[in-house]
């Protein structure tokens, strides 16, 4: 039977971000959104302020198709930008303020925003790099006081958000540049709406109080510039949850908000959780109702034990910038530490495979490893103005994660390694290649390998294995490397987190059969020398 012809007056409902706000404004109009200690507003207020922000941007010259950058902490202002900017047809460009100044400048020039909303804490950074801007950009300075409020208060609270093409770009951000310059990743309205529905289904379909539900009090502890705060602000808003935004991360303030606002659900990288657990007030704070999703780096067993002792329900999840990010989550109903730390089960609509180099699937035996490749309706379709990297990302019709893992008989995934030797420290990624290039330029260095060594607090820390030239003073080589890396940090070329913890001298660096550094053997040697376990 042929499909029915669409009626001329039928409404083809587009999947748009504005629809995520509709239900909460009706069913949760009086529900509260808290921003640090400075602001409390209802969902009805949020709806009005989103319209005022859109009008303020329009008065500033922003039109459909333009890009608006944001440099702010995790605040109600950022949440308002999550909606107002894409809803008016512009692109929300979340600028990663943790990149080095040189990388921030690169992303701004490459991403080409027409206007940037800048919190006063980041004005010095903008002042330092603006001479390198390759185009005129409107800068709107804001702060925790009157600046932002006066800006939007002067704007009307009525704005007719258009019915956009659901495939229109809604957001843009940049990867952390582990293999060269950061890459631009964008998402459409359709992708973000489907990701929101996937999050709600994937994290909500668990018995009892496990997971992410209508009764939770939500507080993000992942920067909102990082993959839309993992997408949870959109999901929390669609569900009409009580939301708490902590501003600049401070462990004392975070603990205070958890206690005062009865926060029950957060997500973060291991370093942030470690920071909270290390604070003296942690032992005086009741954390037994706090559910935390850990991602961005491997979950150290020691951190998992400390969290359990504090009464925190801790589970792992997995994704990446190019996947919006949700791909898998551990069994949220389990209290078994081994299960809680697993990479977990694919989310709804996620087609996940582990394959060989020629894209053949491997057995689901809990042992055979391969590269993790995925399909889902919310994956990025490529990198901004980078066709070669985009083709590589989607080689064979699946998105290549670059992660190595295996699938258990029950269908759950476990990540075991990275195809490329990126170093993950505190949720930040450091390029081993950049460190190697810097060190190899120093006096007396014959060859060098940068690897990540396990660290209970940071997940990994960089270590250099250095082969020096004959008749060279090791102490002088060490001094030169340290000074050169510190100089690169001082000028903003690399992050301070890239400074290696150790420099180890070796007689030779092992090679593979094709003459490349054998990082696996280097790592084994370094771990043995440092008496560490992988």
Question: Which ranges hold each PLM region?
Answer:
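Conserved beta-loop-beta connector loops within the AMP-binding
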Residues: 351-373, 409-410, 472-478, 518
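Gly/Ser/Thr-rich phosphate-binding loop
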Residues: 238, 263-268, 277-338, 351, ...
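ANL superfamily adenylate-forming
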Residues: 123-166, 193
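Conserved pre-ATP/AMP-binding loop-to-beta segment of ANL
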Residues: 29-31, 156-174, 180-181, 207-217
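Conserved AMP-binding A3 loop
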Residues: 42-44, 170-198
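Conserved AMP-binding/adenylate-forming
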Residues: 13, 37-39, 54-102, 429
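Conserved AMP-binding/adenylation subdomain of ANL enzymes
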Residues: 193-217, 225-264, 279
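AMP-binding/adenylate-forming catalytic core of the ANL superfamily
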Residues: 99, 105-106, 116-120, 266, ...
